[in-house]
Amino acid sequence: MKRRDLERLLRVAGCFLKREGSNHSLWTNPKNGVTEAVPRHNEIKEPLARKILKRLDAE
């Protein structure tokens, strides 16, 4: 999955970018308070993308 597609799904679900690290970005879902690291690669493997979406309740 492309990183921009994953970020679009996160924004639609109400998540926001908390901060940018050197290798990862931290996204937070204010509804459940969970923060998840999203790697800064153009292509993110499907299992990892599904895990991130599931943890942030963005499925």
What kind of region is each of these model predictions?
Residues 1-19, 28-59:
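Basic nucleic-acid-binding interfaces
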Residues 22:
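Cytochrome P450 catalytic-core helices
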